[in-house]
């Protein structure tokens, strides 16, 4: 292993639960406004997970007042307080970009049994 691998290994978080595309999760994000800091919850469906190691990211999509909102987070970011699993989804794809065009019941993902 070279020096960068040691730095990456030290920066990895071990409190992240195992989740995959199709899962519904709550991401508790630290938001800093001036001198105040608060926790904001972003609840949605994971539509992709990409990369590996310290550079790994995931994208969460939700509908807010009829408008689709997507947010991409680094998995090992210090700005993420914690991640909660809500529902395990049963999907057959690794990237769920097709959910962008679907609305209502068609955008619903089956729960894994």
From Swiss-Prot:
The keyword tRNA processing does not apply. One of its GO terms (molecular function) is structural constituent of ribosome. GO terms for cellular component: cytosolic large ribosomal subunit. One of its GO terms (biological process) is translation. Keywords: Ribonucleoprotein, Ribosomal protein. Belongs to the bacterial ribosomal protein bL19 family. InterPro entries: Ribosomal_bL19, Ribosomal_bL19_CS, Ribosomal_bL19_sf, Translation_prot_SH3-like_sf. Coiled coil: none annotated. It comes from Mycobacterium leprae (strain TN). Pfam families: Ribosomal_L19 (PF01245). This is Large ribosomal subunit protein bL19. This protein is located at the 30S-50S ribosomal subunit interface and may play a role in the structure and function of the aminoacyl-tRNA binding site.
